[in-house]
């Protein structure tokens, strides 16, 4: 069994700033559940939300790489349960500042995109990277984990 994530190569000003600060090609991470729902901590709506299309709220023409993380059925159930419990929680702007200042700034009741993915993996007993806390996980780090496997690329419409 596995879960998938969508790694966006955003084009907006905010996306370019995120890519510069995190020194990577990705500006956003969304979690793709197996029932065609997509969960993302999205600064555009200030919360963790559910969408049904990878293009929802994203600029047309944005490249998106899809990655997969293998896990057992119990792990996948724990992952999904944790992700769904976070829907509606606020966006973690303080956590983004933590990347800029290279500090541990974050709020444990709020999420930014890749932090939510990493925390969900940890909740399911799937560590993405050794010695890296969820709040330290950028979209770039999520994609270079030995647990993530590139599947394909798409472009938003």
Sequence positions of predicted segments:
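Activation targets extended, charge/polar-rich intrinsically disordered C-terminal tails
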Residues: 96-157
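Extracellular cell-wall/glycan-interacting regions and their flexible linkers
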Residues: 43, 48-49, 54-74, 131-133, ...
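A structural motif
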Residues: 60-61, 72-95
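Exposed alpha-helical structural elements
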Residues: 13-17, 74, 78-82, 140
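Loop/turn positions that initiate beta-strands
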Residues: 1-3
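Glycine-rich catalytic cores of cysteine/serine-nucleophile enzymes that process amide/ester linkages
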Residues: 6-70, 96-105
């Amino acid at each position: 069994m596995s879960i998938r994530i969508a790694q966006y190569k955003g084009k907006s000003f905010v996306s370019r700033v995120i890519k510069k600060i995190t020194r990577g090609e990705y500006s956003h991470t969304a979690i793709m559940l197996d029932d065609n729902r997509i969960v993302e901590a999205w600064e555009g709506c200030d919360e963790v939300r559910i969408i049904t299309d990878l293009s929802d709220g994203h600029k047309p023409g944005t490249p998106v790489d899809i990655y997969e993380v293998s896990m057992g059925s119990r792990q996948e159930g724990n992952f999904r349960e944790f992700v769904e419990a976070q829907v509606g929680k606020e966006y973690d702007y303080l956590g983004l500042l933590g990347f800029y200042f290279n500090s541990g700034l974050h709020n444990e009741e709020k999420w930014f995109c890749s932090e939510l993915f990493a925390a969900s993996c940890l909740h399911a007993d799937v560590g993405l990277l050794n010695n890296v806390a969820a709040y330290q996980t950028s979209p770039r780090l999520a994609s270079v984990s030995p647990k993530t496997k590139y599947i394909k690329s798409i472009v938003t419409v």
